[in-house]
């Protein structure tokens, strides 16, 4: 948490993107999962929110979901919810050069919206205005 706070303090929310490279086990119950393809992938174990190799001697990949990153930045990084969402939406869109269609709720933008509750638990998802 101290590193998160320092990074945002020095760079600002507009220069920090929250990004996840989570593997297939993200958001799934603890237990066995697969890293890579089903046919040629490596079996891993998800425990305590971490993916580990079966011998539990090394990490096997990230299981951090986007909502978890927003929650961590808000709670542990002590940033406002607006800043945390900005770092997950508009900052990455700007980095990718698609800030004219993604990253905001505004006329002319893609209606990609994630609705969450006060605990930052996902309640609804809309992609191009279509609820899923």
Spans of features found by a protein language model:
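His/Asp/Glu-enriched, well-ordered alpha-helical/loop segment
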Residues: 3, 7-20, 25-109, 113-115
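Short, Lys/Arg- and Gly-enriched loop/turn segments at beta-strand edges
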Residues: 119-126
């Amino acid at each position: 948490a101290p590193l998160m706070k320092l990074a945002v303090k020095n760079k600002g929310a507009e220069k920090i993107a929250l990004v996840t490279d989570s593997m297939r086990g993200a958001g799934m119950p603890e237990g066995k999962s697969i890293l890579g393809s089903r046919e040629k992938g490596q079996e891993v174990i998800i425990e305590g929110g971490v993916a580990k190799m079966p011998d539990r001697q090394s990490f096997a990949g990230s299981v951090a979901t986007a909502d978890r990153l927003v929650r961590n930045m808000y709670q542990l990084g002590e940033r406002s919810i607006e800043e945390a969402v900005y770092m997950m939406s508009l900052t990455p869109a700007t980095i990718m050069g698609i800030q004219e269609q993604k990253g905001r709720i505004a006329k002319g933008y893609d209606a990609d919206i994630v609705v969450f509750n006060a605990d930052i638990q996902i309640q609804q998802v809309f992609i191009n205005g279509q609820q899923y």
